[in-house]
Amino acid sequence: MTAPPPVLTRIDLRGAELTAAELRAALPRGGADVEAVLPTVRPIVAAVAERGAEAALDFGASFDGVRPHAIRVPDAALDAALAGLDCDVCEALQVMVERTRAVHSGQRRTDVTTTLGPGATVTERWVPVERVGLYVPGGNAVYPSSVVMNVVPAQAAGVDSLVVASPPQAQWDGMPHPTILAAARLLGVDEVWAVGGAQAVALLAYGGTDTDGAALTPVDMITGPGNIYVTAAKRLCRSRVGIDAEAGPTEIAILADHTADPVHVAADLISQAEHDELAASVLVTPSEDLADATDAELAGQLQTTVHRERVTAALTGRQSAIVLVDDVDAAVLVVNAYAAEHLEIQTADAPQVASRIRSAGAIFVGPWSPVSLGDYCAGSNHVLPTAGCARHSSGLSVQTFLRGIHVVEYTEAALKDVSGHVITLATAEDLPAHGEAVRRRFER
């Protein structure tokens, strides 16, 4: 009897000495081609910018077969959703909110004043974005956790005005899923829009008038994950509003050695593959025995996985693989080059190995810190950079919703003390009017 084919493709980097750039080229990476859908999304954004809610509702009816009575969800529907929420789900959401607030409440930066001399100060003042739109996707699953992960840091930053946008659902009379509504109400958000996709992003950016004549006020910033069309719309609208990031398909990398339990490793790889057929699951290990055992576990666990078809497509896609390396040192180089959204460390000395990681959206240390914990109740944020963007970007946090403003205050004497240098530099850059703006202050 022949052995079943391996679930995951293998990439053997043992004996290879590659630069970070060469590693990135050798490692599996899927992702979606946002550029390819821009021609489709651009007219949607333009139409919503011109016709507002009417266009957004038309697109929703055309794409999804759902046309809500209005964009804004009535307060009574939010109250009813929270009242009807399953008690266990409500309790779990409350725990998630408490733990997420505990972590994020300490993240807010304080104003800092630097004195450069008598009468010369520069203060960095942190000011929250005034109005933020938080997108919560529909699709393969319901994501009340995304409501929490977006709303909590925005509230901790002091954002005054929040609106949650989520796709209307035919089975809920054109409202977003009631669990989404309940999560918003639980967090004290009273403005929820029943609109999804690229048209939701455009409506958040440009605003409009609802079917009852009420204003749909545009936002200053849009955050939250979504599909490729949502991502494309965020790209097109980012000159008008700020965005958090262009989210791609989710990904997990696991750095594991011979001490790791293949049952845990396989379960964690499957857990992220459950999100999307484009999700990436990557194991980086120096242990061929662990690679074999994990592949066998994957084959076995897939038999009882609820979303087997979706998970199998993700695991067998070009974005997923087992990467064999010489040792843990080589594995660290690989995962730093890969810059995963989620990185688990399951090695003999996991905390020490984790301290060497410089590029990851979030790091989960040891066998009892699975990514699923971070998705819900670790207290960390699960809106994280994908597609290698962890090399230069961070996950959603309180800082996402804050703007640093430099406040410069000099006295006459302080300006006079540095005026000669200002005039010299302005002259060197052939900007004489800059120097004159200083010199004329001391003419009389």
UniProtKB/Swiss-Prot annotation:
Cofactor: Zn(2+)
Keywords: Amino-acid biosynthesis, Histidine biosynthesis, Metal-binding, NAD, Oxidoreductase, Zinc
Gene Ontology biological-process annotations: L-histidine biosynthetic process
Binding site for NAD(+): Y135, Q199, N227
Binding site for Zn(2+): Q272, H275, D375, H434
Pfam families to which the protein is assigned, alphabetical: Histidinol_dh
Class of enzymatic activity (EC top level): oxidoreductase
Catalysed reaction equations from the record: L-histidinol + 2 NAD(+) + H2O = L-histidine + 2 NADH + 3 H(+)
Superkingdom of the source species: Bacteria
Gene Ontology MF, one: NAD binding
Disulfide bonds: none
Quaternary structure annotation from Swiss-Prot or TrEMBL: Homodimer.
UniProt xrefs under PANTHER family: HISTIDINE BIOSYNTHESIS TRIFUNCTIONAL PROTEIN (PTHR21256:SF2), HISTIDINOL DEHYDROGENASE HDH (PTHR21256)
Protein name: Histidinol dehydrogenase
